[in-house]
């Protein structure tokens, strides 16, 4: 079988680069951060330009951290400035390098998610000039995988030259530069891009391209740390590995030879993927990804609140989310037979002494290592598949009341419609034989069922009309009374994409 060649392309600081280009600025020479300052300085930064990152600023930190780091960097510049005095500011990296008397400044650009999606679509059209859609997997808004195995002979180019040709076309078309990784499988091209390319100098256009095969991976990355730099190795997996004496991928590979059972004991079936990656193997192809069909499907909605909510106010938000999720089901022609609700509590429940004294339940740690009350989680089943707003809203409200601690502040919530199917594929009710008895009024039952069917049909017409109006006039063209109550978030979220300004 012919050896495969894959290219992974990551658009450099994508959101920040778009904002620079729209201002006529060079993304490689401009200090800019994409963040919604109206949400306070605790808001997460969606992107940071490379020049601003050079001051030790994380690409996904919070705005107050950016301001603090710039303040610290300016303190250092002042010490080294002539007369220990800074005179003027600049957000251009080249000016700051040339003039030590200038203070570091930066632009805060509010996010425009719809605009970034438009840019991403334009860039995807560039990829299509070179590669067929069946050989492209869109990994995220700013990252793709390309199977270029059958294109190298066609273009009479090496993988490196083809990657460069595509990236320079993107640069010419949009002004956005990129980093690329080339590998003999999807894992290796991703790791080449994420790890190796970061440690090689960029060319004059800011482009970095790195290559890996299995043997080069073992030679160069078996000793690399930290483990979390590797694709699909999160903090939880890395912590377990380190607790068992494995600090590098080389350690994992060695363990797989000497004590494979330990890895399966720690990670179950997921150990197979970890072992493969430790050796630089990845059998999954783009063709396999394209052909994959999950055995079970779901639709979900999640939200992190800007501040802690009392349970009753949080219930309002859950009802709003459920209402919109049901409309999404109807719009897609889907039905569900199970709703799942997860409620995450706020750190204030344990940092506030009075609240902590009242709480005696289980405690867990959030992603930042802080103690919080254990999240609430539950599910509720229907006797058949449905997309009825009335039925689903009642079920989720009942589930909320059942699982949520009424004394705790809520910070995050997730609503999931499970086992979704196309309505035409859903099992029909009353399809089998019915056991008759002498004590049931079947005429009354039949009338009751007719009334229920009529109510569902009326509801379906209302749902269809609501969707039609929202599509024509915008998501906020029709609002319910609950959307106008104090603490409601749907109206604002309707103007967002992915929780950020559209």
List the model feature ranges, each with a label.
Residues 18, 369-502:
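Acidic, metal-coordinating catalytic segment for phosphate/diphosphate chemistry
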């Amino acid at each position: 079988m012919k050896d495969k060649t894959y290219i992974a392309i990551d658009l450099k600081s994508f959101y920040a680069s778009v904002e620079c280009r729209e201002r006529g600025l060079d993304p490689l020479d401009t200090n800019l951060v994409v963040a919604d300052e109206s949400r306070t300085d605790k808001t997460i930064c969606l992107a940071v330009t490379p020049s601003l990152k050079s001051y030790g600023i994380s690409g996904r930190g919070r705005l107050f951290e950016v301001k603090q780091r710039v303040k610290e960097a300016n303190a250092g510049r002042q010490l080294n400035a002539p007369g220990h005095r800074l005179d003027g500011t600049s957000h251009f990296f080249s000016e700051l390098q040339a003039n030590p008397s200038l203070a570091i400044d930066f632009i805060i650009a509010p996010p425009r998610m719809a605009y970034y999606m438009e840019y991403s679509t334009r860039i995807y059209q560039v990829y299509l000039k070179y590669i067929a859609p069946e050989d492209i997997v869109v990994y995220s808004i700013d990252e793709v995988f390309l199977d270029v195995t059958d294109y190298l002979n066609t273009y009479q180019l090496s993988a490196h030259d083809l990657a460069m040709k595509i990236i320079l076309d993107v640069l010419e078309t949009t002004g956005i530069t990129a980093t690329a990784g080339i590998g003999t499988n999807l894992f290796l091209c991703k790791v080449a891009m994420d790890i190796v390319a970061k440690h090689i100098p960029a060319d004059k256009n800011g482009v970095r391209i790195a290559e890996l095969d299995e043997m080069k991976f073992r030679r160069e990355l078996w000793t690399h740390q930290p483990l979390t730099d590797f694709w699909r190795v999160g903090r939880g997996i890395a912590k377990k590995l380190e607790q068992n004496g494995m600090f590098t991928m080389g350690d994992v590979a060695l363990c797989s030879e000497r004590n494979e059972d330990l890895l399966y004991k720690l990670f179950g079936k997921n150990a197979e993927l970890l072992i493969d990656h430790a050796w630089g193997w990845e059998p999954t192809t783009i063709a396999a990804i394209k052909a994959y069909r999950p055995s079970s499907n779901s639709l979900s909605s999640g939200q992190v609140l800007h501040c802690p909510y009392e349970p009753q106010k949080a219930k309002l938000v859950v009802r709003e989310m459920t209402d919109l999720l049901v409309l999404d089901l109807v719009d897609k022609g889907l039905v569900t037979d199970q709703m799942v609700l997860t409620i995450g509590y706020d750190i204030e429940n344990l940092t506030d002494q009075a609240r902590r004294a009242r709480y005696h339940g289980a405690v867990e740690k959030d992603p930042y290592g802080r103690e919080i009350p254990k999240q609430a989680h539950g599910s509720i089943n229907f006797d058949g598949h449905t997309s009825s707003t009335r039925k689903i809203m009642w079920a989720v409200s009942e589930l909320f009341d059942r699982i949520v601690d009424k004394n705790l502040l809520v910070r995050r919530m997730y609503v999931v419609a499970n086992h979704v199917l196309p309505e035409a594929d859903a099992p029909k009710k009353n399809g089998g034989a019915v056991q008759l008895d002498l004590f049931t009024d079947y005429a009354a039952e039949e009338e009751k069922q007719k009334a229920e069917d009529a109510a569902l049909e009326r509801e379906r017409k209302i749902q269809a009309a609501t969707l039609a109006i929202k599509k024509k006039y915008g998501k906020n063209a029709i609002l319910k009374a609950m959307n106008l109550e104090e603490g409601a978030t749907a109206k604002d979220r309707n103007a967002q994409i992915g929780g950020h300004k559209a």
